[in-house]
Amino acid sequence: METPAKINLFLEILGKRPDGYHDIRTVFLPVSGLSDTVVVEHATPPGFELHCSGLPLPANEDNLCWRAAMAFCQHFHISPQHRILLEKRIPVAAGLGGGSSDAAAVLLELLALEKLQERECELWELAAALGADIPFFLDPRPAIGEGKGERLSPLSVHEPLELLLINPGFPVPVRWSYQHAERPQGMQPLEFSKLMDILQKGSCKEIAEAAWNDLEFAVFRKFPILQMLRSSLIDHGALCVHVSGSGPTLFAVCNPGSSAALQKNIAGEFGEFASIFQVNA
């Protein structure tokens, strides 16, 4: 199963919850052109195995795929006798939801492998307990996320978006981004009702102008190289540049047909350390 990355086109922090999480309102968009691959099969001899290739990842309980498999087996009273093969291409701890996407794929593949499709409705609760982004990846289509991000409403987006994703090569923990989130005084996101209207009727340029992320201000302060990347992307014609999720990956919304040239320009300046992906949302 191919497991897509995502961006958060819009992310607004509404407040902190008693459980330590934050209430947010976000717009999830899946992207085509950057994904991992997850295969789940019965293990022979019986036992549980996780094999990772591609980008380095732990193949133990620190891996969300492992935890998803254990949670599934416990919930459905199944002995964990499976082999998971994970080919990792989405950058890790990057704000692109790669681990969450992989975990959702494990849940879905186990459901099919164990012929439990009639109980698919039970996956949402499992997914939400594992991570706030994982429910989105059970059915990765444009959506509004509320609560911790796990309460989803379908969303139609009028214009497909041509994007560059630029990952600077270092991770940023989700916890750090939320702990240090601070919106500059006087800055406000667009009213959500207006954002919905733009997403459903607006042009690519109007959608780009409505993008927002409350987490990015702290990330830009902490890592000046990201501000340099952002400035260069804007100088070379990007319509907007924002941090995706908790970062540090940047997404640049491009004029239609311009992403290849922009990728070439940015690779010439920053390609020695940054990974650049040309994708669509």
Across the structure, where does each feature detected by a protein language model lie?
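Conserved, helical-rich catalytic subdomain that frames metal- and/or nucleotide-binding sites
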Residues: D139, A143-C240, G257, K264, ...
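Solvent-exposed alpha-helices and their adjacent loops that cap or buttress functional pockets
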Residues: P30-S32, A128-A129, P135-L138, P154-E159, ...
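Short, basic/glycine-rich phosphate-binding loops at helix/coil junctions
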Residues: T44-P58, V106, A128, K201-W212
